[in-house]
Amino acid sequence: MKRKLSWMCAAVIGLSAFPAFITAAAPATPPLINAEPTEPAQSPATQAPVVAQTTPSREVKLTFAQIAPPPGSMALRGVNPNGGIEFGMRSDEVASKAVLNLEYTPSPSLLPVQSQLKVYLNDELMGVLPVTKEQLGKKTLAQVPINPLFITDFNRVRLEFVGHYRDVCENPASSTLWLDIGRNSVLDLTYNMLAVNNDLSHFPVPFFDPRDNRPVTLPIVFADMPDLAQQQAASIVASWFGSRAGWRGQRFPVLYNHLPDRNAIVFATNDRRPDFLRDHPAVNAPVIEMMSHPDNPYVKLLVVFGRDDKDLLQAAKGIAQGNILFRGSSVVVNDVKPLLARKPYDAPNWVRTDRPVTFGELKTYEEQLQSSGLEPAPINVSLNLPPDLYLLRSNGIDMDLNYRYTSPPTKDSSRLDISLNNQFLQAFSLNSTQETNRLLLRLPVLQGLLDGKTDVSIPALKLGAMNQLRFDFRYMNPMPGGSVDNCITFQPVPNHVVIGDDSTIDFSKYYHFIAMPDLRAFANAGFPFSRMADLSDTLAVMPKSPTEAQMETLLNTVGAIGGQTGFPAINLAITDDSAQIADKDADLLIIGAIPGKLKDDKRIDLLVQATQSWVKTPMRQTAFPSIMPDEADRAADAQSTVTASGPMAAVVGFQSPFNDQRSVIALLADSPRGYQLLNDAVNDSGKRAAMFGSVAVIRESGVHSLRVGDIYYVGHLPWFERLWYALANHPVLLAVLAALSVVLLAWVLWRLLRILSRRRLDPDHE
């Protein structure tokens, strides 16, 4: 019903606008020169339909800096004339108006009128912007109306550059053929909300919509201050939504007995429920119900009901592991029974480390491993690895690469470049031998494709927790050209390249060992908690009376870990009793304040209180997170105590005093504004990237990290690997030991040879 209404609205828009859109396209195409603002040409194609005027609407500005490939600007050239942006539309909304505001600069060498910029939406031509003489070499503003009839769940705006710099004998690869699209270009959209039925068969829509590229903001509502079981249930739900949000990011504002004005999750029992549910009938089982907001029928609430806290936990696990069975306005979660225990390092978002992994398993969309064009776009593969993978003495990571490509017409310098994290690794020539062409013609692939199979050794020290493997197929394409009297013309044909799904990469031969504390591992991969994807080795320590801000910090943190692992925290344990932390073999996640049993520990390098805080600073601070200073530079040089009224937060890591293989991560703040800074940092990928070492201080100015104090090691290495690791930072000692070993070995051999010589000369001598 919802989708039918969406199409009905779109049809009304399109049918009323289509004739006027054709006639209005011409006056809308002349761009603005030198960024002089003018009112956009109005046409019925870009007006909200009458049917949508009484429904709630929202206006969205999508800048190219936000949604275009980094850095947001585009350089369209003769051999690579296409650029584009992508955006989605929520299933509970319909677009009623769309305008593309372009900022671009054409090359001064272009021929006016013959050169132009074509704008497509989902391969439908929306408008043409001819390049005029006045625009050459100057920044130009133009507005192109977009017919909302063509806006669907997933959309692509494609910009095609048609460039000419001479009348005859052009070279498409000429450096004078270019048009730059500015990162300040904006797509203005107006969305109208659709009334959605209370039907859980679409779950998690509308609470999370995969078509929406924005960070997920999902308020969590409690009747009052939640107890430990309710905190655990909310953590399970938040981590599951975080696992679905993934790269988008997530935030979970917490409200006590107060409803937000947007879609939200509500936790309630028969005895403890928000005021708006006072008249709701009592339940006799764990129930998940979708209902409308009492003040706004366009806003939906997912109410997690239960007779008691035990029911809430069961319902939360039902959301995380049984939602594929949801339908109707409510469901009863009868049972959630685990069948297999999770294993270390089995997070779904991490590359497997127990066997070789195929590239087909690493794909995130169907055509990721192929590309086409005169200059095929790079093929990218993401590798998310456990941050404690020990690669120090590795000769490289084995990768068995199978690839196919269009044969170069001649033997030239066409090649395949392989890069890791923007660092060049290796190049391979693209062959054009006749034997290979004949062999491949017998294979069930596109005619004219060559096949290559290459073993690549990846320098292991370049790998981190999040990695990008890139394959660039670079062709030396023959181009038309010449002079007016001797012109060579032909039609260039696109090249096709494919990385085989059966290509493999192998991380199964490596140990798990890491130097701690390492806040970069926590910020980028949720480590050490994410070692077990279900957080079964994690104990969260909360205040006895958590505030809304402290609860939000807990939910944001477990949501971020869920986004990094791809699995909900169904076995997370939570306590507010500091006496229990010494008895549990677990990594500790502390929210709010460090318990008294840990506060006086010498391992702590920073402490944040209401108005007073102190910090230890190292002898010498490194400027780069990847550089590990030696022990003398890490030593605490001074301890400073400051009293201030401004907000501050911090993330502190140190070794657990109860188990030398366990770690403590404390998220601290001195005020409500401090918790806001802390939550902003947890949800901001740029601020998380600034966290490293043992201390990250968060202020209004940003995040500042320190690597101070002793380090400890988590994981296991065989004795010989541990010996090499210990000697790696002491080359002089290693040289002395090597020399002594050589002398000792020579002496042993000398003694052995003397004994053998005596026996040979005197057989009777014992």
Regions found by a protein language model. Give the residues of each.
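Bacterial N-terminal signal peptides that target proteins for export
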Residues: 1-11
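N-terminal acidic, proline/glycine-rich, low-complexity intrinsically disordered segments
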Residues: 2-3, 18-31
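Bacterial N-terminal signal peptides
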Residues: 10-20
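Solvent-exposed alpha-helical segments and adjacent loops
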Residues: 26-766
